[in-house]
């Protein structure tokens, strides 16, 4: 009986692994219609009785401004072009900081944040961290870096019910994502650690200072030239949709 149970569990695990691989492969080309975080926020609103409208409009890579791409990289993951999903040095630094009793510090790369926002629930449990590592590895293996950043910018939370760059640009600045200035892009990146408490449209002194630091980091990283490092290197005959 125990043997049969283990066999069934093994088959179930193999099916779940196969489904996760197929899902990540599909989302390399298909825009995700929603994310796990969006579902979580909706459930949260039902439980609290506070209605919330989720706003999100997909914008393809070519319509997302370089300033926003660079602002997010400068703020969240400056080694994005170099790592394979995990910034080991940042993880070690965060663990050391947390062990010393400081405020909890994260070390999530953009790839890890995409995995978490798309597929997983919030929390710090070990099972969730294990699944995050699994999905991060799949994303890095199957998606080019441009796709990872494209999905991130279209899925990240930028306020209550505000998801993605287009909704954020309209909500905070009354404009479309393609028309964001470098200053506006840096403000959006500055609030990412706490987008439900901080406002890009009405920034505090701290947010303004952080945005100024982000603009400085953007210049030090080389501005839009940095983005050439995450451009897929394909031969001329390679289909554009791959």
From Swiss-Prot:
GO terms for biological process: cell wall organization; peptidoglycan biosynthetic process; regulation of cell shape. The chain crosses the membrane at residues 12-32. One of its GO terms (molecular function) is pentosyltransferase activity. Signal peptide: none annotated. Its main location: membrane. Peptidoglycan polymerase that catalyzes glycan chain elongation from lipid-linked precursors. This is Biosynthetic peptidoglycan transglycosylase. It comes from Stutzerimonas stutzeri (strain A1501). The lineage of its organism: Bacteria, Pseudomonadati, Pseudomonadota, Gammaproteobacteria, Pseudomonadales.
